């Protein structure tokens, strides 16, 4: 999945459509910033999909799709470091410093020195 090793941040991420294309092209997501709670939850679900698929545990994702496990049970299978890449906050003067700090923390935890691309929805 990480063929080219390039990293990105997704601003105004929505439900993650742009991220889907970047992930499928081998980019590594650093953070997804989205103010809508439900769109952020969709991104978390996609993170779960890619994590489980990449770790040979895709069966758990299919169990979730079939209603055999709850969303909470699904997300408990995913490392917190992966899920915290979803920053569910509105970007404003009041929140921007906290968002930058959260992104810096994620970069440090992932050992990322630079972000290669910043993408954003309309």
Locations of the language-model features?
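Conserved active-site and SAM-binding loop architecture
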Residues: 1-122
